[in-house]
Design a protein with these regions (language model features):
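Residue in the alpha/beta-hydrolase core beta-strand immediately N-terminal to the catalytic nucleophile
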Residues: 30, 66, 89-92
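Catalytic active-site module of serine/aspartate enzymes centered on a nucleophile-bearing elbow/loop
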Residues: 206-249
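Acidic catalytic loop of the alpha/beta-hydrolase fold
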Residues: 186-191
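Conserved HGGG/HGGXW glycine-rich cap/lid loop of the alpha/beta-hydrolase fold
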Residues: 1-42
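Short beta-strand/loop motif that positions the catalytic acidic residue
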Residues: 176, 182-184
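Conserved alpha/beta-hydrolase catalytic His-Asp/Glu region
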Residues: 101-104, 115-175
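Conserved acidic catalytic loop of the alpha/beta-hydrolase fold
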Residues: 48-65
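Flexible "cap/lid" loop of the alpha/beta hydrolase fold
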Residues: 75-83, 87-122
Length: 249
């Protein structure tokens, strides 16, 4: 199950699909307020978004999933594993964090969104999501990402950005029982290496992988390396479950 970042949609996972579909059933979804999912009244909470994911898992009838989330998706994954541990077989937390350092930055972004719309956030978002060399040399991809950002409903952004701003779950991380890997781009300014190290240190048994020359959307900047990490981890966990005679969707 793949969970998207703020200001994106399920299409952000396209680089990972060929490899994953060769071995697994893959469920991508648009988080509340994004893509084709319903936009409800803001604000939202990360717990609410995790409950959305749990409801989707129940609806599909798969029982439990190997969950991978990037940025906001990883924040949702943490809460999902805490609130609904029976629905999580393994957890891949990518370019994410357990809390954000200050609400002021998010309040500024929310003000910009209200005054200028999503278009007022695009340039700053691109700078945070990708290293300069990637922006300079990957015009087609950057244009696709720009279009994706611009499709984000304003109220959906406000709802989810408020959830990210208000998130505080570091103190809950030791409750996570699912096997966990943490993946981060070394140059990520949005959810930093230091924030990933908090996840590594606080989640029992978590393993950290750092991708060089990548920023926030490491799955797009370094798709081969990112996908291999994801594929290998899920494969290992699925094999372990199979050997124990347990379901391994």
């Amino acid at each position: 199950m793949l969970s998207n970042s703020l200001m994106s949609n399920l299409s952000m996972w396209t680089p990972q699909l060929p490899a994953l579909l060769a071995a697994f059933r893959v469920l991508r979804y648009d988080t509340r307020g994004h893509g084709e999912s319903e936009v409800t009244a803001a604000p939202y909470s990360i717990a609410q978004l995790a409950d959305d994911a749990a409801a989707l898992i129940t609806f599909t009838g798969v029982g439990a999933v190997h969950f991978a989330g990037l940025s906001m998706g990883g924040m949702i994954g943490q809460q999902l594993a805490i609130r609904h541990p029976d629905k999580v077989l393994s957890l891949s937390l990518c370019d994410t964090a357990s809390e954000m350092p200050t609400p002021a930055m998010w309040n500024d972004r929310l003000s910009t969104a209200r005054e200028k719309g999503i278009a007022g956030l695009v340039d700053g978002t691109i700078k945070r999501w990708f290293v300069p060399d990637f922006v300079a040399n990957s015009a087609d991809t950057i244009n696709e990402v720009r279009r994706m950002i611009l499709t984000t409903p304003l109220d959906g952004y406000i709802g989810c950005a408020s959830a990210v701003r208000d998130m505080s779950q570091t103190h809950l991380l030791k409750q996570i029982k699912a096997p966990t890997q943490v993946i981060v781009g070394r140059e990520d300014p949005a959810c930093t290496l230091a924030q990933s190290q908090v996840l590594e240190n606080e989640i029992p048994g978590a393993v950290l992988h750092v991708i060089d020359d990548a920023a926030h959307l490491a799955n797009i900047e370094k798709p081969a390396q990112f996908t291999q990490l994801l594929f290998d981890f899920i494969s290992t966990q699925a094999a372990s479950l199979a050997s124990a005679g347990k379901p391994h969707q």
